[in-house]
Design a protein with these regions (language model features):
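Amphipathic alpha-helical interaction segments
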Residues: 12, 34, 52-53
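Short acidic, hydrophobic short linear motifs in intrinsically disordered regions
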Residues: 24-41
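Short amphipathic alpha-helical interaction segments
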Residues: 44-59
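A short, conserved structural fragment
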Residues: 58-68
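Short, cationic-aromatic polyanion-contact patches
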Residues: 68-85
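Residue-level marker of regulatory loop/turn positions in helix-turn-helix DNA-binding domains and
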Residues: 6, 28, 46
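Short alpha-helical segments that sit at the start of domains
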Residues: 1-25
Length: 85
């Protein structure tokens, strides 16, 4: 499967999501506001654009997530991340 190349910030997000998902033994991960804030601190270019970047990564077939109800309302739930090479 050929995927389009990612911008540096989207690539950094994808690789970080892979680490988070692996640390959770490939189980679903709720990306609550705390995790999203941490990601924005780690990747400042994504500030206020993290959810847009998640949607892009899903459309480009790098990750899979769904929306679910969490403590802060609707939150993305990461359930698959394709391994970075």
């Amino acid at each position: 499967m050929q995927r389009e190349p990612l911008s540096p910030e989207n690539d950094a997000l994808w690789r970080r999501l892979w680490e988070i998902w692996q640390d959770n033994d490939e189980e679903d991960v709720v990306l609550d506001s705390l995790i999203l804030d941490e990601l924005e601190d780690e990747i400042p270019e994504l500030r206020d654009r993290t959810k847009t970047a998640l949607a892009y990564l899903q459309r480009a077939r790098y990750i899979q997530y769904r929306s679910g109800v969490g403590e802060d309302g609707l939150e993305p739930i990461l359930f698959d991340v394709y391994e970075p090479r």
